[in-house]
Amino acid sequence: MSRMMIVVEFEVKPEHRNQFIELMKGHAQRSRAEDGCQQFDVLLPQEDHSRVLLVEAWRDQAALDVHSKAPTMAKLRETYQPWLLNRKATRCIAD
């Protein structure tokens, strides 16, 4: 089984940046406790304060699928969606 890595880049509306960061920090902490989560970091680029990155590592695709399909994920997306200008996710296999 291959380890799965995801980098998610969010462009956040300035007036919601602090709310978004706090929401993602809580999400990261909860995600780290999930079975199969090997890494879940919230990164704040120094050169662009409108962006927030998530870097995730999962044991395998099955662990990522459980995380992605959890009911809490739908609620999380519903909460932050109005705060975003853009979102880009890149999935990678880490061998």
Where are these regions (language model features)?
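Short amphipathic alpha-helical segments
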Residues: H16-Q38, L76, Y80
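Short, well-ordered beta-strand segments in beta-rich or mixed alpha/beta enzyme
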Residues: M4-E11, D41-S68
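Acidic-histidine catalytic/liganding microenvironments
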Residues: S31-D35, Q61, A70
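Glycine-rich beta-strand-turn "strand-cap" elements at beta-sheet edges
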Residues: S2, D41-S50, L76-D95
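Short linear/disordered segments characteristic of secreted peptide precursors
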Residues: K13-P14, W83
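Histidine-centered active-site/metal-ligand motif
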Residues: H27, H67, T72
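Alpha-helical elements of the RecA-like P-loop NTPase motor core of helicases
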Residues: N18, A62-D65, A74
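Short phosphate-engaging motifs
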Residues: H16, S50, T72
